[in-house]
Amino acid sequence: MGAIAAGIAMFGAAIGGGIGDGIVVAKMLEGMARQPELSGQLRTTMFIGVGLVEAMPILAFVISLLVMNK
């Protein structure tokens, strides 16, 4: 039962992370197209945002390992 719960948790986290990354990158590209002179600042902010979005699947992976090994 723990393996099923871990799989569902990882599925949800992967879908959420993928959608979140897509939104962050799309908005960054919109901003770069609108104001090319701010591309450096936007890129830096995008990398921070993608890192925060990717933290969710990593935490879900750790929690799913804990659930499976319980």
Curated annotation (Swiss-Prot):
Domain of life: Bacteria
SUPFAM superfamilies per record: F1F0 ATP synthase subunit C
GO cellular component: plasma membrane; proton-transporting ATP synthase complex; proton-transporting two-sector ATPase complex, proton-transporting domain
Site positions per UniProt: Reversibly protonated during proton transport: E54
Subcellular location: Cell membrane
Function of the protein: F(1)F(0) ATP synthase produces ATP from ADP in the presence of a proton or sodium gradient. F-type ATPases consist of two structural domains, F(1) containing the extramembraneous catalytic core and F(0) containing the membrane proton channel, linked together by a central stalk and a peripheral stalk. During catalysis, ATP synthesis in the catalytic domain of F(1) is coupled via a rotary mechanism of the central stalk subunits to proton translocation. Key component of the F(0) channel; it plays a direct role in translocation across the membrane. A homomeric c-ring of between 10-14 subunits forms the central stalk rotor element with the F(1) delta and epsilon subunits.
Membrane topology category: Multi-pass membrane protein
Encoding gene per record: atpE
Family statement: Belongs to the ATPase C chain family.
A Pfam family this chain is assigned to: ATP-synt_C
Name this polypeptide is given: ATP synthase subunit c
Keyword line: ATP synthesis, Cell membrane, CF(0), Hydrogen ion transport, Ion transport, Lipid-binding, Membrane, Transmembrane, Transmembrane helix, Transport
CDD domains (alphabetical): ATP-synt_Fo_c_ATPE
Subunit and interaction comment: F-type ATPases have 2 components, F(1) - the catalytic core - and F(0) - the membrane proton channel. F(1) has five subunits: alpha(3), beta(3), gamma(1), delta(1), epsilon(1). F(0) has three main subunits: a(1), b(2) and c(10-14). The alpha and beta chains form an alternating ring which encloses part of the gamma chain. F(1) is attached to F(0) by a central stalk formed by the gamma and epsilon chains, while a peripheral stalk is formed by the delta and b chains.
Transmembrane region(s): 4-24, 47-67
Database matches in InterPro entries: ATP_synth_csu_bac/chlpt (IPR005953), ATP_synth_F0_csu (IPR000454), ATP_synth_F0_csu_DDCD_BS (IPR020537), ATP_synth_F0_csu_sf (IPR038662), ATPase_proteolipid_c-like_dom (IPR002379), F/V-ATP_Csub_sf (IPR035921)
GO molecular function: lipid binding; proton-transporting ATP synthase activity, rotational mechanism
Gene3D superfamilies: F1F0 ATP synthase subunit C (1.20.20.10)
